[in-house]
UniProtKB/Swiss-Prot annotation:
<feature type="binding site">
    <location>
        <position position="553"/>
    </location>
    <ligand>
        <name>Zn(2+)</name>
    </ligand>
</feature>
<dbReference type="InterPro" id="IPR037219">
    <property type="entry name" value="Peptidase_M41-like"/>
</dbReference>
<keyword id="KW-0378">Hydrolase</keyword>
<dbReference type="Pfam" id="PF06480">
    <property type="entry name" value="FtsH_ext"/>
</dbReference>
<dbReference type="Pfam" id="PF17862">
    <property type="entry name" value="AAA_lid_3"/>
</dbReference>
<dbReference type="GO" id="GO:0008270">
    <property type="term" value="F:zinc ion binding"/>
</dbReference>
<protein>
    <recommendedName>
        <fullName>ATP-dependent zinc metalloprotease FTSH 2, chloroplastic</fullName>
        <ecNumber>3.4.24.-</ecNumber>
    </recommendedName>
</protein>
<keyword id="KW-0645">Protease</keyword>
<dbReference type="InterPro" id="IPR041569">
    <property type="entry name" value="AAA_lid_3"/>
</dbReference>
<dbReference type="InterPro" id="IPR011546">
    <property type="entry name" value="Pept_M41_FtsH_extracell"/>
</dbReference>
<dbReference type="GO" id="GO:0016887">
    <property type="term" value="F:ATP hydrolysis activity"/>
</dbReference>
<dbReference type="GO" id="GO:0005524">
    <property type="term" value="F:ATP binding"/>
</dbReference>
<comment type="similarity">
    <text>In the N-terminal section; belongs to the AAA ATPase family.</text>
</comment>
<keyword id="KW-0812">Transmembrane</keyword>
<comment type="function">
    <text>Probable ATP-dependent zinc metallopeptidase.</text>
</comment>
<feature type="transit peptide" description="Chloroplast">
    <location>
        <begin position="1"/>
        <end position="32"/>
    </location>
</feature>
<dbReference type="InterPro" id="IPR003959">
    <property type="entry name" value="ATPase_AAA_core"/>
</dbReference>
Length: 676
């Protein structure tokens, strides 16, 4: 018996889906000239020839050096210095030739191992000492010193050996540079390592997104602003004649799934001018300075194709308020933002470029980015109302088949808080269910199951009869009774024992309209209704038998009561806003930096006021359960038998035992009631 669904101020936030993309942006193919191909071929042939000559010449040079050594009498046989002294003492040395300043000696000596034949050996000397020279003179041995002689081949060999690696390195870098700049792959091709600073924006000279303003519904005000921008691009003389200038930027602000990107696709398809699109996260890379370089490159290309439109999706990835990052003023993201600010409205200006950006976190954007001159217009794209939801359902339902019992107006009334993406997902889920069940059209049953699945989760296995099922039934009926009998509460739409997600049972409440202003009576009534499940458990089964099933209910009503005290000023403390604006921000850093402006005494008063509201609401819930015990038993009996009761069925049974408040009465024919 998990949290009960109670549709408080609005529906619980839903996982949103992105509208299907309408096409892939085409990338222009760069074709190099034949002359450039010939030049590159010549360079490659020259490099191959040079490397080939080097490969052939190295063995030749090595052979030449070996021959030169042999001419100088350098033997491959070696003799140790101690053995040389031994041969010298035994008068076996005949001749000594000294090389390299007396450190190398080529010795002609008589070798007993070779039958007293003369052998030429090489001896490494520790140095030409006077004692050794004196000894050579005493033995009357012929010795001579030779200077180092190098021919031109040896000089060339040493020169090539010293310059080979630098030349190969420089040549490789040169080839990489030519490939990156000469069209051999472009920014995403094989030459890309040197193209990090290039913009990754998708460019379309004649955008073909497949989306027009006719495909956008439910956001009429935002659509009107964009239609003016398109009109300005197509017929600028109508506006310049009265001194108007084209807006430099339009910022789309709204929750996820409300159609911000869809509006950008529509303006791209309607404007008829070059269109650049990029995500804010594509500016920042792992290398320092890449983000600012990409911003410069993007606006350089935009100026070359002006007038044009630049669309930056999720601009909060790069436009976050400065000074809140870990890196401080040297943060790479801040450098990118500074360059973006300069390009949008700096000394040079960007005449003819309209920047359109979208975000769902406008509260964390830098104030310099939001000022007029950069983003002249801020268009709010909010969750649609009943009329907007109806228009959106008509757009997404145009290619689907519905049974005669399905009304798009009824679906719109049953889905408060749904965004455009949620409604598109709803109809798609209903179509999938209809196909799975072998139907040729979508019925109200598929619509009902799809709404339940989106809001509460997958349908689980129904519980077998027993104490747990009875406890869940009393818990859910307690919610329904307390909500229906408390003035100002939303009407019951459905009570069910079919598990969904983590909930063992569900009670659905649905507002009769879309309330933009909620009164204190309505908020307090929702707290009473939320505590009805725990009150029913305590009255029916006793205080020791209350369960953890009300954990989600308690979390919701505690948060609502705290909002009444801290945010809305609906308590005995007075009409104060007791929450720092920074603490309400969606940014974690800004919440950490927010100053706690309340004293310990005030914090204690807030806790007392929240507890007073909860206790008062719980006493009312207990009283309503005690007073309507007979009605509760009857409703639970029917619910255990049918497992699901519609709002009309529930109110019909309850009205037999007690009178429903006038403001909570719902006509039986209301569109909010579900088919049984």
């Amino acid at each position: 018996m998990a949290p009960t669904s109670m549709s408080l101020a609005a529906k619980t936030p839903l996982p949103f889906s992105t509208l299907p993309s309408s096409g892939v942006a085409q990338r222009p193919v760069s074709v190099t000239a034949s002359l450039e191909h010939k030049t590159n071929d010549a360079r490659r042939k020259f490099l191959k020839l040079a490397l080939g000559n080097l490969g052939v010449g190295l063995p030749t040079l090595l052979g030449a050096k070996r021959a030169l050594a042999e001419e100088q009498g350098v033997s491959s046989s070696r003799m140790s210095y101690s053995r040389f002294l031994e041969y010298l003492d035994k008068d076996r040395v005949k001749k000594v030739d000294l090389f390299e300043n007396g450190t190398i000696a080529i010795v002609e000596a008589i070798s007993p191992e070779l039958g007293n034949r003369v052998q030429r050996v090489r001896v490494q000397l520790p140095g030409l000492s006077q004692e050794l020279l004196q000894k050579l003179r005493e033995k009357n041995i012929d010795f001579a010193a030779h200077s180092n002689q190098e021919d031109s081949g040896s000089l060339l060999f040493n020169l090539i050996g010293n310059l080979a690696f630098p030349l190969i390195l420089i040549g490789g870098l040169f080839l990489l540079s030519r490939r990156a700049q000469g069209g051999l792959g472009g920014p995403n091709g094989p030459g890309f390592p040197l193209g990090f600073g290039q913009s990754r924006a998708k460019f379309q000279m004649e955008p073909n997104t497949g989306v027009t303003f006719d495909d956008v519904a439910g956001v009429d005000e935002a659509k009107q602003d964009f239609m003016e921008v398109v009109e300005f691009l197509k017929k600028p003389e109508r506006f310049t004649a009265v001194g108007a200038r084209i807006p430099k930027g339009v910022l789309l602000v709204g929750p996820p799934g409300t159609g911000k990107t869809l509006l950008a696709k529509a303006i791209a398809g309607e404007a008829g001018v070059p269109f650049f699109s990029i995500s804010g996260s594509e500016f920042v890379e792992m290398f320092v300075g890449v983000g600012a370089s990409r911003v410069r490159d993007l606006f350089k290309k935009a100026k070359e194709n002006a007038p044009c439109i630049v669309f930056v999706d999720e601009i909060d990835a790069v436009g976050r308020q400065r000074g809140t990052g870990i890196g401080g003023g040297n943060d790479e993201r801040e450098q990118t933002l500074n360059q973006l600010l300069t390009e949008m409205d700096g000394f040079e200006g960007n005449t003819g470029i309209i920047v359109i950006a979208a975000t769902n976190r406008a509260d964390i954007l830098d104030s310099a980015l939001l000022r007029p001159g950069r983003f002249d217009r801020q268009v709010s794209v909010d969750v649609p109302d009943v009329r907007g939801r109806t228009e959106i359902l008509k757009v997404h339902g145009s290619n689907k088949k519905f049974d005669t019992d399905v009304s798009l107006e009824v679906i719109a009334m049953r889905t408060p808080g749904f965004s455009g993406a949620d409604l598109a997902n709803l109809l798609n889920e209903a179509a999938i269910l209809a196909g799975r069940r072998g139907r040729t059209a979508i019925s109200s049953k598929e619509i009902d199951d799809s709404i339940d699945r989106i809001v509460a989760g997958m349908e689980g296995t129904v519980m077998t009869d027993g104490k747990s099922k009875s406890l869940v039934a009393y818990h859910e009926v307690g919610h329904a009774i307390c909500g229906t009998l408390t003035p100002g509460h939303d009407p019951v739409q459905k009570v069910t024992l079919i598990p969904r997600g983590q909930a063992r049972g569900l009670t659905w409440f649905i507002p009769m309209d879309d309330p933009t202003l909620i009164s204190r009576q309505q908020l307090f009534a929702r707290i009473v209704g939320g505590l009805g499940g725990r009150a029913a458990e305590e009255i029916i089964f006793g205080e020791p038998e209350v369960t953890t099933g009300a954990a989600g209910d308690l979390q919701q009503i505690t948060g609502l009561a705290k909002q009444m005290v801290v945010t809305f000023g609906m308590s005995d403390i007075g009409p104060w806003s007791l929450m720092d604006s920074g603490a309400q921000s969606g940014d974690v850093i800004m919440r950490m930096m927010a100053r706690n402006s309340m004293s310990e005494k005030l914090a204690e008063d807030i806790d007392t006021a929240v507890k007073r509201l909860s206790d008062e609401a719980y006493e009312i819930a207990l009283s309503q359960i005690r007073s309507n015990r007979e009605a509760m038993d009857k409703i639970v009996e029917v619910l255990l038998e049918k497992e699901t009761l519609s709002g009309d069925e529930f109110r019909a049974i309850l009205s037999e035992f007690t009178e429903i408040p006038v403001e909570n009465r719902v006509p039986p024919a209301t569109p909010a009631a579900l088919p049984a």
